[in-house]
Design a protein with these regions (language model features):
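Glycine-rich, flexible loop/turn motifs
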Residues: 65, 81, 147
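Conserved active-site tyrosine of GNAT-family acetyltransferases
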Residues: 54-60
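Surface loops and adjacent helix of pleckstrin homology
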Residues: 48, 57, 150
Length: 176
């Protein structure tokens, strides 16, 4: 997939060719087509270690490692009461876009609107009473829920957002 998150940025990730079609160049064709559509943009890549040499041949370099963390929603502790956590719909959308843009690579209102309003999706904000101090969203998967985007001013706010979000979810909750 290639997702254009803003006018200047796109992310590439997760393309898999079925085993019976591997070795015929289909993966490379998909890769070249995806990169060609976004020539001139800054590209981010969700990469698998086994393909790092392939990605490097196209100019990508590893910036950091990534790990997935998962837990059953019901096994997480309760959130702190009165932590200033509200549904994201409780603030004007332009404020949410501005907060997200300050933590991403720029504004992405169309992506954000779709991301937080799709079926089964949930999103929360943290507020100090005057401004947004955190934002988290979840989406359903075949096996549970994925968390992201997820931005917070500090670890306490992040913890409260995650735990509050988990109270409305069932099954595994994953973040990576």
């Amino acid at each position: 997939s290639v997702v254009r998150g803003s006018p200047e940025i796109a992310f590439v990730g997760l393309y898999i060719v079925a085993a019976e079609f591997r070795g015929r160049g289909f993966g490379r064709q998909l890769w070249d087509e995806a990169l060609g559509k976004f020539d001139g943009l800054t590209l981010g890549l969700d990469a698998v270690p086994e393909q790092e040499a392939t990605y490097a041949s196209d100019g990508f370099a590893s910036a950091y490692g990534n790990a997935r963390f998962s837990a059953e929603a019901r096994e997480l502790p309760d959130p702190e009461p009165d932590a200033g956590i509200l549904p994201s719909s409780s603030v004007p959308f332009d404020q949410l876009v501005a907060f997200d843009a300050a933590h991403y690579f720029g504004p992405r209102p169309a992506f954000l609107r779709t991301w937080i309003t799709g079926e089964g999706r949930q999103s929360l904000i943290a507020t100090d009473g005057t401004s947004i101090t955190g934002f988290v969203a979840s989406r359903p998967t075949r096996t549970g829920n994925r968390i992201g985007p997820f931005f917070a001013a500090n670890a306490t706010i992040a913890g409260n957002l995650l735990l509050e979000l988990a109270t409305g979810l069932t099954g595994p909750v994953s973040i990576d």
